[in-house]
Design a protein with these regions (language model features):
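An aromatic- and glycine-enriched ligand-binding surface/loop that stacks and positions planar moieties
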Residues: 20-82, 181, 189-192, 200, ...
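Long, intrinsically disordered, low-complexity segments
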Residues: 18-21, 39, 50, 58, ...
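Flexible, polar/acidic helix-loop-strand segments at domain edges
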Residues: 84, 88-93, 316-380
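Bacterial Sec-dependent N-terminal signal peptides
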Residues: 1-28
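Conserved, well-structured interaction surfaces
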Residues: 39, 43-47, 51-57, 80-154, ...
Length: 495
């Protein structure tokens, strides 16, 4: 693991636009040299644990580029060496020196250490028990989330559950995948028992982790790791409970990424962004979302500073069914409606397509580095599709129709007979298809592919021409720099 300075005397606090609990200067800090005593101290510490979610190493770039590995899109961008580390990953020719893999390894680590700090310090504090429970619940949720990212990308990783008092405390061997998932599940169960529901939060705290967020995360963990009847039943129970807590689908699919409607009725957990000027993108101080900037059509003038990354492939676009309104709300294609009277040209892209769903107008985001557009990590449509999948895998295929239809109906696919009377295998294929289209470019497709049964990931990748992909590529390599810093780290098979 990267040698990092431990959190001891000062805890940096990230505060983000869109939720008051994070809407302050990024350099507020907690001086623990005089003791860790007040609610403000505890809240500042847990706020700091959210910060790495914002970074380019995670949701501001690397997580969504996993869709490129998954074959939904190509890098695009400026060509040449622009994004070559992502190109190498997507073409399955990367090695252990790959910079994108290094980012993904390093991204969650500071968050884990900050959660450990909270979990060590807060239990002994003499503060209101409800607030204490909520703060501990947030830390448990976030630690589980960071480890869930790591274990799906790399397999076993060092299991750090205490604050690091020296660099040597970080030089741990890799724990087993089973050990990592045991911690993830335990942490999420703690989070569920401690966190408030979203309806119990004041507006000033909107955007914090909630009971529902932890429940949805646990359902996803079960879908990934266990895949047995007992846990599929638990997934259905969790998803039903979330549905009873007031969540519903947005009427307009496009509203999910409208900054004016963030943390809405469909949203379960979002990475909060604070549109801040004069911050370097690669700096950990950056608080602005670059999602619209990265994915908008390059040189089109449609929005501020578009780079043209993550260009949808023709194979992906062909998967849209006739009448699916998500097509024109997800991608730009020749002849599609745009905004501000502009016309889309396939010349803006090497594939002939660009991602539309995240693009902000110049009115919404007049400067490329001032966007407060959140990243939606978990939303209710995902919960409905997990429920449908779990029901089908239990052999309850007819019951899987209703949650699947609810998602498809919002997309304009109102012919329910198209999903009725299917075999379990046919329904499985429908749900896989629906997850791909509904959650396109949101960072889920790669994680879905590697959890599907029957060698799905490699068969799909080979079918679209990514023939260099092999079983070793289902995990990323442990980065060379990390193994040089920590000789206890072993490499993944084949790398």
């Amino acid at each position: 693991m990267k040698k990092m300075k431990h959190i001891s005397l000062y805890v940096a606090v990230l505060l983000l636009c869109g939720c008051d609990f994070l809407n302050r200067s990024p350099y507020d800090s907690v001086d623990t040299s005089q003791g860790f005593q007040t609610v403000a101290d505890a809240e500042a510490a847990v706020n700091a644990a959210y910060q790495p979610l914002q970074w380019a190493k995670l949701y501001n770039m690397r997580i969504w580029t996993l869709d490129i590995m998954a074959g939904n899109s190509e890098v695009g961008a400026g060509g040449g060496t622009d994004g070559e580390e992502t190109v190498d990953l997507a073409n399955f020719i990367a090695d252990a020196d790959n910079f994108a893999a290094l980012d993904l390894w390093r991204g969650p680590s500071p968050g884990i250490l900050r959660c450990n700090f909270v979990l060590q310090k807060v239990p002994a504090m003499d503060i209101d028990e409800a607030i204490k429970n909520r703060i501990l619940g947030e830390a448990y949720f976030l630690r589980a989330h960071y480890y869930f990212i790591l274990v799906r990308l790399f397999g076993g990783v060092p299991l750090q559950t205490e604050p690091a008092d020296s660099d040597s405390d970080l030089l741990l061997p890799r724990a087993s995948v089973d050990e990592i998932y045991e911690l993830i599940e335990s942490d999420l169960e703690e989070a569920i028992s401690r966190l408030p529901k979203r309806s119990e939060y004041a507006q000033a705290n909107m955007g914090r982790a909630t009971k529902e967020a932890a429940m949805a995360e646990l359902a996803r963990v079960y879908m990934t790791y266990h895949q047995d009847y007992e846990h599929y039943q638990e997934v259905v129970t969790l998803c039903d409970a979330i549905g009873e807590m007031g969540y519903r689908l947005e009427e307009d699919y496009a509203d999910l990424w409208n900054p004016a409607k963030q943390n809405g009725v469909e949203s379960i957990f979002e990475v909060q962004y604070y549109g801040k000027t004069n911050y370097d993108f690669w700096s950990n101080e950056n608080q602005a979302s670059w999602l619209s900037t990265f994915t908008g059509p390059r040189n089109s003038g449609m929005a501020a500073g578009c780079y043209g990354w993550n260009q949808p492939t023709a194979e992906f676009v062909r998967q849209y069914e006739t009448g699916d309104v998500r097509k024109e709300k997800t991608i730009f294609y020749t002849g599609c409606p745009t905004f501000d009277g502009m016309t889309y040209s396939s010349a803006y892209s090497t594939t002939g397509y660009n991602v539309r769903k995240f693009l902000l107008t110049k009115t919404q985001s007049p400067d490329y580095n001032t966007s407060n557009q959140n990243w939606v990590v978990t939303r209710y449509a995902d919960v409905l599709l997990m429920k449908a999948e779990a029901l089908n895998e239990m052999g309850q295929t007819t019951l899987a129709e209703a949650p699947l239809y609810e998602v498809r109906c919002r997309a304009g696919l109102t012919n329910r007979s198209s999903i009725e009377g299917l075999s379990q295998m046919q329904m499985r294929e429908k749900i896989i298809h629906e997850r791909r289209m509904e959650l396109a470019f949101e960072g889920h497709r790669w994680f879905d592919m590697i959890r599907y049964k029957d060698n799905y990931a490699l068969e799909f990748l080979h079918s679209i021409g990514k023939t260099a992909a092999s079983s070793k590529h289902l995990l990323l390599p442990i980065p060379t720099q990390e193994r040089e810093a920590n000789p206890k780290l072993t490499q993944n098979p084949g790398w």
